[in-house]
């Protein structure tokens, strides 16, 4: 028989840097889950990723105080900022408020990486989504 699910916890944690301090500790402590076990498991699961990369994780809490978790690909904004070589997006988006640029080939590469977790039918659809995200961040999209 399947375990009874008591809740889901969605967090964004830097790869390889899960520790019991906020936001991880309080979120898991509310459900009575073993915080240190999660930290060890998460850090082991993200061992092959770049340290510090933000990783969305969905933790499923069960009635017997056990858990399972699923890691997802980092947010689009992380990849876009990395491709453009900037620390943060524009604070004033619109015409003339560009803070960097990305090429279509970079967007296609990001789309292929993110395709698993994007709501798109094909890579071209994912690229169009990324173009919109890039423009809203103040990045100009150039051919190349």
Swiss-Prot record:
BP terms from Gene Ontology:
translation
PROSITE patterns found in the cross-reference section: RIBOSOMAL_L11 (PS00359)
Asked if rRNA-binding is a keyword of the record, the answer is yes
Q: List the Pfam families.
A: Ribosomal_L11, Ribosomal_L11_N
For this UniProt record, the keywords arranged alphabetically read as follows: Methylation, Ribonucleoprotein, Ribosomal protein, RNA-binding, rRNA-binding
**SMART domains in the record, alphabetically?**
RL11 (SM00649)
Record PTM text: One or more lysine residues are methylated.
Record's signal peptide: none
Cellular component, GO, one term = cytosolic large ribosomal subunit
Which terms in the Gene Ontology molecular function aspect does this entry carry?
large ribosomal subunit rRNA binding; structural constituent of ribosome
NCBIfam families on file: L11_bact
Entry function: Forms part of the ribosomal stalk which helps the ribosome interact with GTP-bound translation factors.
Q: How does it assemble?
A: Part of the ribosomal stalk of the 50S ribosomal subunit. Interacts with L10 and the large rRNA to form the base of the stalk. L10 forms an elongated spine to which L12 dimers bind in a sequential fashion forming a multimeric L10(L12)X complex.
Q: Mind telling me which PANTHER family this protein's record contains? A: 60S RIBOSOMAL PROTEIN L12, LARGE RIBOSOMAL SUBUNIT PROTEIN UL11M
* Similarity annotation: Belongs to the universal ribosomal protein uL11 family.
State the protein's name: Large ribosomal subunit protein uL11
């Amino acid at each position: 028989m399947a375990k009874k699910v008591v809740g889901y916890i969605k967090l964004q944690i830097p790869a390889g840097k899960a520790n019991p301090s906020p936001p991880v500790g309080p979120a898991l402590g509310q459900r009575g889950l073993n915080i240190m076990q999660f930290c060890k498991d998460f850090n082991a699961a993200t061992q092959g990723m770049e340290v510090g990369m933000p990783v969305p994780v969905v933790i499923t809490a069960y009635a017997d105080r056990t858990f399972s978790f699923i890691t997802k690909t980092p947010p689009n904004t992380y990849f876009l900022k990395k491709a453009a070589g900037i620390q943060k997006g524009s604070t004033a988006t619109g015409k003339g408020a560009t803070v960097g640029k990305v090429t279509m080939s970079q967007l296609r590469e990001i789309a292929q990486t993110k395709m698993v977790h994007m709501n798109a039918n094909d890579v071209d659809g994912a690229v169009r989504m990324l173009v919109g995200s890039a423009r809203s961040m103040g990045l100009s999209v150039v051919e190349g």
